[in-house]
């Protein structure tokens, strides 16, 4: 079965169950932390794919990755147990990402990423967040990243759109224009 189809089925079932129980917000936080753990700790996936590691140890590892030292919700533990029992732990990263997407659609939350060459103050960040929320008619989750390689300006990703106003991109365009003009001369 395809990764996307399987992940969507599990995530959709989980969000419907969470809505019935009224715990979708808590599960969102747990799946958000779990997906972040997969991103920053690539060895987590390798351990979950290892057949030598017991299901009990995998469950403890996943709960720790999702909540740190806190206690995982009963619904989260039951869901992870189901995934482990069906030997779908290799899909857990994708399931958690699908759950996040479904939750954001359900709660009308947009995702934005602001990349700048220098740190942005909180006031500017809040103005960007509120402007994007007004345009999308949704709440915004805004992640700010500092990347000196863009040399100045900013890159703003919002949902599936990108506004690139970086100096590095503008310089690349000017360079490409010079190259194109020189090709015509030769």
Swiss-Prot record:
Repeat among keywords: no
Keywords: ATP synthesis, Cell inner membrane, Cell membrane, CF(1), Hydrogen ion transport, Ion transport, Membrane, Transport
Gene Ontology CC: one annotated term: proton-transporting ATP synthase complex
Record InterPro entries: ATP_synth_OSCP/delta_N_sf (IPR026015), ATPase_OSCP/dsu (IPR000711)
Spans traversing the lipid bilayer: none
GO biological process: proton motive force-driven ATP synthesis
Principal subcellular localisation of the protein: membrane
Compartment list: Cell inner membrane
Membrane topology category: Peripheral membrane protein
Record-level Gene Ontology MF annotations: proton-transporting ATP synthase activity, rotational mechanism
SUPFAM superfamilies noted in UniProt: N-terminal domain of the delta subunit of the F1F0-ATP synthase (SSF47928)
Similarity comment text for this entry: Belongs to the ATPase delta chain family.
HAMAP family: ATP_synth_delta_bact (MF_01416)
Assembly mode: F-type ATPases have 2 components, F(1) - the catalytic core - and F(0) - the membrane proton channel. F(1) has five subunits: alpha(3), beta(3), gamma(1), delta(1), epsilon(1). F(0) has three main subunits: a(1), b(2) and c(10-14). The alpha and beta chains form an alternating ring which encloses part of the gamma chain. F(1) is attached to F(0) by a central stalk formed by the gamma and epsilon chains, while a peripheral stalk is formed by the delta and b chains.
Annotated function: F(1)F(0) ATP synthase produces ATP from ADP in the presence of a proton or sodium gradient. F-type ATPases consist of two structural domains, F(1) containing the extramembraneous catalytic core and F(0) containing the membrane proton channel, linked together by a central stalk and a peripheral stalk. During catalysis, ATP synthesis in the catalytic domain of F(1) is coupled via a rotary mechanism of the central stalk subunits to proton translocation. This protein is part of the stalk that links CF(0) to CF(1). It either transmits conformational changes from CF(0) to CF(1) or is implicated in proton conduction.
Protein name: ATP synthase subunit delta
Lineage: Bacteria, Pseudomonadati, Bacteroidota, Bacteroidia, Bacteroidales
Name of the gene: atpH
